[in-house]
Regions:
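Class I (Rossmann-like) S-adenosyl-L-methionine-dependent methyltransferase catalytic domain
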Residues: 1-96, 110-128, 132-196
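Short catalytic micro-motifs in class I SAM-dependent methyltransferases
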Residues: 105-109
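A conserved beta-strand element that flanks and buttresses the S-adenosyl-L-methionine
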Residues: 102
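Conserved acidic residues
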Residues: 99
Length: 196
């Protein structure tokens, strides 16, 4: 995608991930807490987390080109981030590696139950007990496709049900995302804590 379009010309572009940042602040995590941004690619969330002095950041994306956009934008500051080109359904993290798992717009692309199960296994393994998971997907009245691909739309209850009893739902947020093309995409964010 990023080899054909500028980072600010894709439907999911945001100058700042304000909804995500507000939820991250609500967690009260410290600046040295381990944070992963799943599907972070060219997102500016990492810029804002670095500006807030977060020091243990991982950005995972399946697209090397998207990661390169962010690295180039950050310049020397990119060396403070762990960049991981991987498919989230295929990667295995060390146990309890992260205090915060953030995903805006990856989980809704997992239309296959087996892919969702692998994703959820990765979350369950990688997030510390007491850690937080913030996941943003298209809402029930959001788009049925993104970039020509089908997606699953969620309510807070159906999204939390995917994650199961090991995660306590702390809250939800809705976002009307205005795309660069002048359309509105309705997002739902769930904010959970891992029990145990």
């Amino acid at each position: 995608m990023y080899t054909h379009k500028a980072a600010d010309a894709v439907s999911w572009y945001q100058p700042h991930a304000d909804s995500s940042l507000a939820l991250i602040r609500q967690t009260g995590i410290t600046a040295d807490a381990a944070v992963i941004d799943v599907g972070g690619g060219a997102s500016t969330l990492v810029d804002d987390l670095l500006a807030a002095r977060h020091s243990d950041l991982t950005v995972l994306d399946i697209s090397a080109a998207a990661l390169d956009v962010a690295r180039h934008r950050l310049g020397d500051a990119a060396s403070a981030v762990h960049w991981l080109e991987a498919d989230i359904t295929q990667v295995e993290f060390p146990e309890h590696r992260f205090t915060l798992w953030h995903d805006r717009a990856v989980f809704h692309f997992l239309t296959d139950a087996a892919d969702r199960a692998r994703y959820l296994k990765a979350v369950g393994r990688a997030v510390k007990p007491g850690g937080f998971v913030i996941v943003g997907t298209f809402a029930e009245d959001g788009p049925e496709q993104c970039s020509g691909l089908p997606v699953r739309r969620y309510s807070a209850d159906t999204l939390h049900d995917e994650f199961g009893a090991q995660f306590e739902l702390l809250g939800k947020a809705e976002e009307n995302h205005h795309t660069p093309f002048g359309t509105v995409q309705k997002f739902l964010y769930c904010y959970c804590r891992k029990l145990g």
